């Protein structure tokens, strides 16, 4: 585990470090910085949800307005994409939205860890959602669900080719869903570290360069605000695409 205060490499912030080693029968169940911050995000989600139920007032304060805004955004997303049938899936979609939002925002805290910056997490989450959505489709439509891969009126000669193309375009959703979140969070945090390192180098050099370090520092502050917006946007986009994919399965699009 790195003990120095200044991170020397822009990619060092993504290193998974074992905090508490633990294994059973050769299986590794160690607590890492990634799992630790994921647990923190889950506890924050539970805490936020409990406040939503028990700390409301007739005249909403600023904190209550934030809670209600996130709820309304998610509810509107579900209503626009799933309609009335989305009410059954709202608890899952709302939880997913909040979890990703907290994971992204926690990663903006200096010397924390961005769980969503690792493709292992985003791909695992996207694959789990994809499997669940397909199970819902099979449960809802039975074997008719597989008609998704064969549109009506297709000539028999091109059926094998079309099924292959439709199947590949269907499973690629897992990769687009996971890579989009992973790539945006990784690239944004890397850029922030590079600019922060550049500002620190200029300040350490002293003299005239120490004065001009305010330029990259101002740029860093501006990009930090932009990255905060991206953190919220990527959580929204991931959840929105989940709603769209779920609707495609329910309506056989």
Curated annotation (Swiss-Prot):
Recorded topology in the membrane: Multi-pass membrane protein
Transmembrane segments: 34-54, 89-109, 118-138, 156-178, 203-223, 226-246
PROSITE patterns the UniProt entry points to: ATPASE_A
Organism domain of life: Eukaryota
Principal location class: mitochondrion
Keyword Mitochondrion included in the entry's annotation: yes
Keywords associated with the record: ATP synthesis, CF(0), Hydrogen ion transport, Ion transport, Membrane, Mitochondrion, Mitochondrion inner membrane, Transmembrane, Transmembrane helix, Transport
A Pfam family it matches: ATP-synt_A
One GO cellular component term: proton-transporting ATP synthase complex
NCBIfam families found in the cross-reference section: ATP_synt_6_or_A (TIGR01131), PRK05815.2-4 (NF004482)
Record's protein name: ATP synthase subunit a
Family: Belongs to the ATPase A chain family.
GO molecular function annotations of the record: proton-transporting ATP synthase activity, rotational mechanism
Function noted in UniProt: Mitochondrial membrane ATP synthase (F(1)F(0) ATP synthase or Complex V) produces ATP from ADP in the presence of a proton gradient across the membrane which is generated by electron transport complexes of the respiratory chain. F-type ATPases consist of two structural domains, F(1) - containing the extramembraneous catalytic core and F(0) - containing the membrane proton channel, linked together by a central stalk and a peripheral stalk. During catalysis, ATP synthesis in the catalytic domain of F(1) is coupled via a rotary mechanism of the central stalk subunits to proton translocation.
Subunit structure: F-type ATPases have 2 components, CF(1) - the catalytic core - and CF(0) - the membrane proton channel. CF(1) has five subunits: alpha(3), beta(3), gamma(1), delta(1), epsilon(1). CF(0) has three main subunits: a, b and c.
Subcellular location per the Swiss-Prot or TrEMBL entry: Mitochondrion inner membrane
Organism: Chondrus crispus
Stored CDD domains: ATP-synt_Fo_a_6
